[in-house]
């Protein structure tokens, strides 16, 4: 909180010597709000920004660039506070005003377009995000130049959107090209270069290239600690991503060890109630669940959920995500009535808060179907998965990872229901699509191939026993 204390003292001095309406005083008020935001105190940040906005609109006018910038910061804070839909409304209004006041080619106007694209991505509107980035990139290149940090950042965000949309192979190519350009134009230690390396590692993970992801993150972690310091939030984030890579590689003991060490470091540096600390607690709980210790996962998630309810509120996406993880832990513990009850309540909340088409809402529908299947209600699970598959195909597209996962779950449920012929047909089609989209060496492709081989061998054995 040193930054907060510094700006609070400066604000007191400037208010006394310059007056509350002096531009320098207003700038310090804005900087203080920035510090609140960066410390994770988003409620206080929003309160401070709103006060700055009122003062700047009164003193400088509603169309002054500083007033517009304050509105932009408020929208950004709403986005990271888990309210991207409100951020989208604000960004759209700011964009209209910046075009009118500053012109379409002003750097701030271009930033508004990029911010809007990012908010679309946060809201699960990936196609809108990609479309926006692809239209703003040529303008950024024309006006600011291809090597400007904002142009490079927009390229990174576009690649990130492709990866989130379910095209990790395409994202990898984009990130690798971008990395070469950022190293050349900004240098190997620039924050954009380091961020690109981290995003490339994430794309490697999503593409099933886990060894490449681990190697990239281990090297990046060393460079982050050297350039940013061991206690910098970006260094912490890299440690978290490295643990996630170990988790996905089924090296759960290593993942849990990294998460626990990270949590011990985040608590004194960021504070136990910081959003990043919450994220680590959630990831640690998930790792315990995957390590077949669901009771430990339940214990961690219940404590985390209580803290998120009080700090973030019941409707924050992170709070909803923890409810989802808690339901999954109950599912793994085979406490199916509790898992079903929690998932149904969560689905109602996500539909209300995020909307029925948000990816997180769709994931909960899939988890609920899986719980019904495990509880023996296979017909209900099949009906739910078929409806979910239709919606995912419409919203996310047929090649998205979530859509493919639902097809896999549907095939398995048909198999459990005794319809092996239909299951084999679905697995055969799914294997072809996984091979085309993810490649034959992706872990999910290999898993489907192994399942299909097993089913065909079982069919051959049954036929030869007749």
Question: What is each of the regions a protein language model found here?
Answer:
Residues 1-466:
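Intrinsic-disorder-linked linear interaction elements in eukaryotic regulatory proteins
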């Amino acid at each position: 909180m040193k930054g907060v204390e510094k700006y609070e003292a400066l604000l007191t001095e400037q208010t006394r010597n310059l007056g509350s309406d002096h531009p320098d005083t207003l700038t310090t008020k804005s900087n203080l709000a920035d510090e609140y935001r960066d410390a994770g105190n988003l409620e206080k940040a929003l309160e401070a920004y709103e006060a700055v906005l009122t003062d700047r609109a009164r003193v400088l006018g509603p169309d002054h660039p500083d007033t517009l910038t304050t509105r932009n910061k408020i929208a950004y804070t709403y986005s990271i506070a888990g309210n991207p839909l409100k951020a989208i409304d604000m960004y759209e209004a700011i964009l209209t005003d910046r075009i009118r006041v500053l012109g379409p080619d002003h750097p701030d106007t271009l930033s508004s377009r990029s911010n809007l694209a990012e908010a679309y991505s946060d809201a699960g509107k990936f196609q809108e995000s990609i479309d926006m980035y692809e239209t703003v990139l040529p303008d950024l290149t024309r006006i600011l130049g291809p090597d400007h940090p904002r142009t490079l950042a927009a390229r990174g965000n576009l690649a990130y959107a492709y990866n989130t949309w379910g095209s990790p192979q395409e994202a990898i190519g984009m990130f690798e090209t971008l990395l070469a350009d950022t190293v050349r134009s900004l240098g190997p230690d620039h924050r954009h270069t380091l961020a690109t390396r981290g995003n490339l590692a994430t794309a490697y993970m999503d593409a099933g290239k886990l060894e490449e992801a681990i190697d990239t993150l281990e090297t990046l972690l060393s460079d982050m600690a050297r350039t940013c310091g061991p206690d910098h939030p970006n260094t912490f984030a890299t440690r978290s991503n490295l643990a996630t890579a170990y988790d996905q590689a089924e090296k759960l003991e290593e993942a849990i060890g990294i998460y626990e060490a990270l949590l011990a470091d985040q608590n004194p540096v960021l504070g136990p109630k910081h959003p990043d600390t919450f994220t680590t607690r959630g990831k640690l709980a998930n790792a315990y669940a995957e390590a077949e210790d669901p009771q430990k996962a339940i214990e961690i998630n219940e404590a985390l959920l209580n803290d998120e309810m009080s700090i973030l509120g019941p409707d924050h996406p992170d709070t909803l995500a923890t409810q989802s993880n808690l339901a999954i832990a109950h599912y793994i513990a085979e406490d199916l009535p509790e898992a079903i009850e929690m998932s149904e309540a969560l689905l109602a909340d996500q539909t209300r808060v995020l909307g029925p088409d948000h990816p997180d809402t769709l994931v909960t529908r899939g988890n609920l179907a899986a719980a019904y299947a495990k509880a023996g209600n296979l017909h209900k699970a099949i009906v739910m998965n078929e409806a979910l598959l239709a919606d995912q195909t419409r919203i996310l597209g047929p090649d998205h990872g979530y859509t493919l996962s639902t097809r896999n779950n549907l095939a398995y449920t048909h198999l459990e229901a005794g319809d092996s012929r239909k299951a084999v047909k679905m697995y055969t089609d799914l294997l072809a699509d996984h091979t085309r989209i993810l490649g034959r060496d992706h872990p999910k492709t290999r898993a489907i191939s192994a399942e299909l081989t097993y089913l065909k061998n079982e069919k051959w054995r049954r036929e030869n026993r007749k």
